Structures are given as structure tokens and as C-alpha cells.
Amino acid sequence: MQVAIGIVVVAIVIYAAVKGFQFYIDKQVRQLTERQQALVKQSQTTDFEKIEQLGLTGGSLAKLEALQSAGQEVDNDQLPAVSEQLTAITSQARGIRFLDAQQNLKKVAATLDTIEQRQAEIRQGLQALDDADAAHRQAVASLEKKYQNIRKTLLSQNFSFGPSIDKLEDQLANLESDFDHFSELAKAGDHDAAEKVLDQLHHDTGTLEMDIDRIPPIYKDLVSGFPDQLAELASGYQQLTAQHFHFEVESIEPEIKALQQAIDDNIALLGDLKVTDAENGNHAIEKRIDHLYDVMQAEIDAKAVVDQQQEEISKFLTHAMNQNHRLQIELDRLAQSYTLNNGEVERTRELNEQLKNIEAVYQADVTAITSKQAVFSEIAAHFAEQDEQLKGIEEEQVAINKGVASLTAEESKAHETLQRFDFEIHAIKRQVENLNLPGLPKDYLDYFKVVAKEIERLDHDINKLVINMDDITKQLIVIQADMATLKEKTSDLTDAAVMAEQLLQYANRYKTNHEEVQEASVEAQRLFTETHDYARSLEVIATAVDKVDPGSYKRIEDSYYANKQADKMNDEA
């Protein structure tokens, strides 16, 4: 019983599965059938007749025929074949050949995709043929009107084109001939061939229109603008030469003639329709004419500058030469008393030579002006250069004069400083002698003698017949530093000697009861009287006394410096 039930269940499951697959395939077939029917309707709406009525020929007709052939293949072969395949798939599903049915469904879907794409290409191809026909009809009307306007322009403005008119008319005639050929092809329906002719027509027509726009202004400059300017230049040149103007390069008249020839050459280029070459030639002519104007104007402007600056340069030059003469006299006087170390005399002579050269050029320019042979631009350049040179010379003269003007004052100050050094070293000597010391340390004596000899040398050099103030100044700087060091050494010597004496006296109270103080006193006394090492003597006795009486050295030291400061303040008061 259970086995029978199991068989029934399996049979039901298998039946349900078969029905499910059949339902799925039927659904897919219905969807694909709908697509196929839609494509059939779409194919029926494709308007081949409209394009056939255009009366195409040549390559355009071949394109139409190819599109018609493709459409017939879709309608007569491909779409009916899809219908048959869908019927076969339904039969396969009924016979439980589900795998075959599934694979064939995919093939049919792919075939429909291909048909859809092919139909789209056919529609696009037909539209392109229709568009080409419309565009060419429009081009025929547009170009015909354009050529009429061009011919009107050439007829009404033929004088504006000069020698170019004949070739412009020839080009227009050629374009009209090509246009007639294009019109014939377009009317005959051979739009492929017509399109090639149209492309060339557009290019050539654009070139002609550009030439028609560019030539009139070029020709106008050549027949009126430039000749008028050359006439003005020639007249201006004659007037300037009559007023005794001269130019750096006497090439204005030849250049005017050369420009007239350049104008003729450019007109010939226009006659050959070499418009770009003629345009470039006009730019070159314009620059050359502008240059001639600039040359003439430069001389006119330069004359105004020369008239204004001639007297100024003369006065400036005279002033500089007088200043240099006075400076040379002053340097000769100072050289009798001082050594001039910075080449002042030689530099002043060089300045004098520069002034002579400036004067020579200036006089030559004045002569040229007087004899009416002046090139004013050259003279104006000379004046500008001379003004800069004279300013530089004046600055150097001032610097030289400033450098030597203080020599006398520096000498006087050096004498005063020498006297102060002499007074100070004698004061130091008296200060040390008043200490009544048994002697002085050798290093101190040596340094004192060095400073004393430096002062003696300075005294000797400053009283020479010819003084080298640079050397005197260097000596003053050295002595100033050495004198400061000597004062410091003297102060240290005095402090050590006086405090050593005070501590030796103070130590007497401890010598009897303290043997170390007794020994230190003997050693300190020996250093004081025999070797004159007062600093060491102070150190020895101070160390010993501080051991038996801590703080005693500090008290004596503080008292000493307090008294020293009080004495200094009293002296200053």
C-alpha cells in the first residue's frame, strides 16, 4: 500500500514539474512572438516609397537598393523563420524536450536582437538619404544666391580690388561652373557624388569670400595710404634738410624710392591673388614707413634737447674744470705737509684728462652746430653722456676734497691726544713712585717701556715735515688700547702692593702664637722686597691670616676699596 502511495506521489511531482516547465516555455514563446509581431509591423511602416520618389542615381541609388534588399531579407526570410522556430519550440515543450526548447529560445532572442538592429540601420540609412536630398536642395538655393551677391560686389566695387579683379572674376566663374555640376548631380539624385563637389565648393567659396574681404583694405593702403605717407615723408625730408638737419645715415631718400618699388611689387602680388604675401608685404612697408617717421621725429626732438641743454652742459663743464683746478692746487699745498695715501693727486689728474676729453667732444659738437652740420640725435646723446660723466666727476671731486679737508683738524686733534698720553704716562709713573716700593715686576716695567716708546715714536712722527695721517691715526688707536691696559696693570699692582703691606702689618699680632703665620710673613716679605711679586705676596699672607682669623682678609680688602673709591670721588669733585 505504501509503495503504491509513493509511486502516486512521485508521479504527481513529475507531472507538476512537466507542467511548470511547459508553462514557463509557453510564456517565453508568447513574449518572443509579441516581439516578432512588433518587428513585422515596424517593417511594414518603413517608407521605401518616399525615398524611391526622390529619383536617386549613382551611389545614392546603390545605397537605396542595398537598404531595400536588406529590408526584403528581414521581411521574407528572417521574420518568417523566427515564427517557424517559435512553433517548433512549442512542439519541443509538449514532447518534454525542455533543454532543446530552452537553447532554441536563446537563439530566437538573439535573432530578434539582430533583426531590431538591422531595421534601425535601414531606417537610419533611409533618413540619411532623405536628409542629403534636402540639404543639397538647400545648398543649391543658398549657393546660387551667394554667387549672385559676390558677382554684384565685384561689379559694384571693382575699383576696390585693383589688379585682383580679373582673377577674382575668373575664380567666381570657375565656382559657378562647379556649382552647375553640383546642381546637376543633386537634381539627378546622385547625392554621394554631389557631396564631394559640395565640400570643395564650400572650401573654394570660403577662400574667395576671404580674399574679397581682405583685398580692398590692402589695395587702399597701396594706392592711397602709403603713397600719401611717402609724399609727406619726402616733403618733410626736404623741409628738414632746408633747415640744415642731418641724419646719422643718409638713406632716407633711397629708402623712400625703395618703398615706392615695394608698393609696386605688392600691387603685382595682388594681381596674382597672393593675398597673404601682399598682406605681409603691407605690414613690412608700414614698419619701414614708421621707422622713417621715427628717424625724422627723433632729429626734431633731439634739436629741442640740444637747444635746451647746450648752455647747461657748457656751464657744468666750466664749473667742473674750475673745481678740478682748485682741487689740484689744494692737493699740492697739502702734499707739502701730509702724505696723501689714497691716490688723490693721481685721481685728480685723471679727472682733469676726462674733463679735457669731454671738452673736446663738446667743442666739436658746438662747431658742428655753428657750421650747420650737426646730427642733433648724436649731439643729444653726447650731452646725456656728458651730463652723467660730469655728475660722476663732481661726486669724485667732493669725495676727494672731503677726504683731505679734515687733515689739518685731524693733525690738531692728534697733537692734543699725544699731549694727553704724555700726561697720563707721567701721572702713572708718579703714582707708582709715590708707593715707595722696593722695586717693580719685570713684566710691568717692560710693558711700561713699550707704551713710553710708542708715545715717543708718535711724538717723532707727528713732528715730521710731511705727516702721514693714516699712520698717525693707526698709532693713536694702538696707544689708546695699550694705555688702557697699562692703567689696568698699574691699578692691579697698586692694589696688590698696598693690601700686602696692610696684611703684613696685621699679621704681626699672630706671628708669636702661630708659627704658620710667622712662616707666611717671612715668605710674603721675601716676595715683596726681593722678587717684587706683590700679587703672590698678598696671596701668601692673606691665606695664612684667614686661617687664624677667618674673614680678616675680606674686611681689609673691603676697607681698602671703600677708601679708594672715596679718594676717587674726592679727586673728581
Swiss-Prot record:
Extracellular side: 1-2
TM region(s), chain numbering: 3-21
GO biological process, one term: septin ring assembly
Location of this chain's protein in the cell: Cell membrane
InterPro entries the record matches: EzrA
Domain of life per record: Bacteria
Cytoplasmic domain ranges by topology: 22-573
Family that this chain belongs to: Belongs to the EzrA family.
Protein name as it appears in the record: Septation ring formation regulator EzrA
Species this protein is from: Lactiplantibacillus plantarum (strain ATCC BAA-793 / NCIMB 8826 / WCFS1) (Lactobacillus plantarum)
Lineage: Bacteria, Bacillati, Bacillota, Bacilli, Lactobacillales
